[in-house]
């Protein structure tokens, strides 16, 4: 941007490991969430290049020449020290440096961020999510772990039996979810952040078999949002998912969860909630 160039992030629409193994690899950030994050950061373009057989077999030199320097017209390329690309991942930062003068771009290799001498990586973040340690995961990510999606109809247990409506999301199978349980959350609806309590799991107290779902009680929101795209940010772990002896016992526990969440926000007045607009007025992406 300082040099007057538009900014672009190059990534693949399908993770290379998924394409090569034939098995879905879960991701911390889905394509839709990544688009929203890039827009929030002010990135001009997000290139989601298809990872197909042609690109898998492309020699790394051709990848640099034909795609990065050719189709994208890159003039400043920024990579990490362990980047890899091209057939069998043979391309690296050294190759990019070697081709720099020939193709007329300038290479920037940035060092990895570390946390107490450990590289911050997706593996490290997944480990913390599996523990339910979203506060640590958020610190590693540099932003709250979030789940985006359209609000769908659930079983109406929240509104008809427990007395308070909830917003249900069905996360895609590729989304890496944290430990099942209840979390303090912040929910973005129509550019406004609200306080929330989010349960992730299979609703063990309710009879029947339910897929893994994300169900959120939203404070201070009293209107129909079915079909709306919302963003649920997890801020702190409350308790693990558990099966209660009755719906009445579950209702009592949820009231305690709401009190826990309210107390969390009281202790963190710096967190934007309850009607304050996000800077820039960003709308959640469809």
PLM region spans:
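ATP-dependent adenylation/pyrophosphate-handling site
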Residues: 1-23
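Residues at the starts of beta-strands that form the adenosine-phosphate
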Residues: 6-8, 45, 106
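N-terminal Rossmann-like or analogous alpha/beta NTP/dinucleotide-binding catalytic cores
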Residues: 16-103
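Structural signal for conserved beta-strand scaffold positions within catalytic alpha/beta enzyme cores
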Residues: 48, 109-111, 234
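Residue-level signal for inorganic ion chemistry
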Residues: 38, 77, 137, 185, ...
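A non-catalytic, amphipathic alpha-helix used as a structural packing/dimerization or gating element
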Residues: 33, 136-143, 249-260
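Glycine-rich, Lys/Arg-enriched anion-binding loops that position phosphate/diphosphate groups
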Residues: 100-201
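Phosphate/ribose-recognition catalytic cores of enzymes acting on nucleotide-derived substrates
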Residues: 154-278, 282-286
């Amino acid at each position: 941007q300082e040099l007057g160039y538009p900014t672009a992030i190059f990534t693949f629409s399908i993770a290379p490991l998924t394409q090569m193994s034939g098995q879905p690899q879960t991701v911390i950030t889905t394509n839709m969430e990544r688009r929203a994050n890039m827009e929030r950061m002010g990135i001009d373009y997000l290139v989601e290049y298809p990872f197909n057989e042609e690109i898998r077999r492309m020699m790394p030199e051709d990848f640099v020449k034909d795609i990065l320097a050719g189709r994208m017209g890159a003039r400043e390329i920024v990579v990490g020290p362990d980047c890899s690309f091209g057939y069998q991942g043979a391309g690296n930062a050294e190759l990019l440096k070697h081709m720099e003068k020939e193709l007329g771009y300038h290479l920037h290799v940035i060092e990895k961020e570390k946390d107490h001498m450990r590289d911050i990586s997706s593996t490290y973040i997944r480990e913390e999510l599996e523990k339910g340690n979203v506060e640590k995961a958020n610190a590693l990510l540099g932003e709250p772990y979030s789940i985006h999606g359209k609000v769908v109809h659930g079983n109406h247990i929240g509104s008809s039996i427990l007395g308070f409506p909830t917003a249900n999301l069905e996360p895609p199978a590729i989304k890496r979810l944290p430990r099942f349980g209840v979390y303090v959350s912040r929910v973005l609806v129509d550019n406004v952040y609200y306080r929330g309590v989010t349960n992730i799991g299979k609703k063990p107290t309710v009879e029947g078999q339910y897929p893994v779902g994300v169900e959120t009680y939203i404070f201070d929101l009293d209107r129909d949002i079915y079909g709306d795209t919302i963003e649920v940010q997890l801020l702190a772990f409350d308790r693990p998912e558990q099966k209660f002896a009755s719906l009445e016992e579950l209702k009592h526990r949820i009231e305690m969860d709401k009190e826990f969440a309210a107390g969390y926000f009281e202790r963190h007045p710096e967190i934007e909630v309850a009607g304050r607009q996000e800077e820039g007025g960003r709308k959640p992406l469809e």
